[in-house]
Amino acid sequence: NNISRMVIRQAAGAISGMIAANVKEANESAGSIAISIFGNTTKCVDKCSEILKVDGYDVSTFHSVGIGGKMMESLILDGYFDAVLDITTTELADNLCDGICSSGPDRLTAASQMGIPQVVVPGCLDMVNYGHLDTVPDRFKDRLLYSWSPDVTLMRTNEVENEILGKELAEKLNKSSGPVKVLLPLRGISIVSSEGGEFYRPEIDQILFDSIKKNVNNSIEVIEVDANINDEAFAELAVATLMKMKSI
C-alpha cells in the first residue's frame, strides 16, 4: 500500500547515501482508505478491502488492539488517508474498562479533526479484552466472560457501559468538520454477538444503538442495517456509503 511503498522508497534513498530522502508518493491509486479490524470483524473488513481494491483504492488495515488504533489515528493526522472505514471501535470499550486493547482517549478523533469522510460502526463494543482469565480485574470476575483463546478473555459489556459508550462515540463524531455516517448492524456487532453466540444480547446492543442515536448531531445520519456486521451485505453497504460520501 501507499505507506509501505513510501517506507521502502525512503529506505532505498537512505541506503544509496542520500542525506535526506524526500520521497513524494505518486498518485498511484483512486485514494487511500484506512480500515479498523479485529478477529471478530475480519470477514467484514476482508470484504470491504476486496471491493475497494477492485475499485482502485489503496487500503490499509489496522488491528484494534491498542497500538493499532493509535497508529491509525496518528497516520490520519499526518494526512495519509482520504477517508476512513472505522468498522471496529472496540478500543473505546477497553479504554472504559481497563482492557488490554485500549488506545487511549484520543481514539476516534483524528478523522474528525482532519475533516475527511468517515463511516463509523460500533464494531465489537460488545466486548472488553483481557489476557488469561486470571488477569481479569476482581471487580469484573462475576461478569459474563468468554475465553476466546487461552491467553485472551473477553468480557461482555453491560447496559451501563453501552449507554456510556454510545454517548462517547456520538460526542466524538459530533466534533467532526467533515461528513460522517454511522452504520448500526442490528443482528450483531461481532461474531460472538450474532444469534446463538456467546455474547448474543440484543437488548444490550439496543441500549448502545439508542444511546448513539439520541446523542449524535442532526447532521450525522445513523443507518440501521438488518444484518450482522460480518454479513456480506453489510460490508457492501459500508463501502457504498463511504463512496457516496467521497463523491459529495
Positions of PLM-derived features:
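A solvent-exposed, charged loop/short amphipathic helix patch at secondary-structure junctions
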Residues: 136-153
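Metallocofactor- and cofactor-centric catalytic cores in central/energy metabolism, strongly enriched
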Residues: 1-113, 118-120, 130, 143, ...
